[in-house]
């Protein structure tokens, strides 16, 4: 078996695509328009990675309740401090740089328009 994708449901497809492209560098890899059946699917991936993030847009559905079971998705960064500063300057909802107790900062979180968190971690940790 091989990991294929993670699906999240979004209330505003264009806002979500823009967030994942601008904040994290994802690119749209494919789209499936099932508007006649009430939904659209957009798949995104990071450069050089075949694992996809699937954005599911159910037409006419409002915001989703993420609940307390969802944690986060994680991506690696070659320039953690630079990516953090850029996202903060561009107005994305980011935490401060963090580390585990007794360790130097090595990650932060950024939140998408629907409230889903992505952990950005220093590559090689």
Where are these regions (language model features)?
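Hydrophobic side chains in well-ordered alpha-helices
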Residues: 16-19, 83-87
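Short, charged/polar surface micro-motifs in flexible loops or helix N-caps
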Residues: 47-51, 60-62, 80-82
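N-terminal beta-strand motif that seeds the catalytic metal site of vicinal oxygen chelate
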Residues: 1-17, 70-73, 121-125
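Exposed loop/turn and edge beta-strand positions of beta-sandwich/beta-sheet ligand-binding modules
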Residues: 38, 69, 104
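Vicinal oxygen chelate
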Residues: 29-33, 75, 84-125
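Core segments of cupin and vicinal oxygen chelate
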Residues: 7-50
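Helix N-cap motif at beta-to-alpha junctions
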Residues: 12-13, 77-81
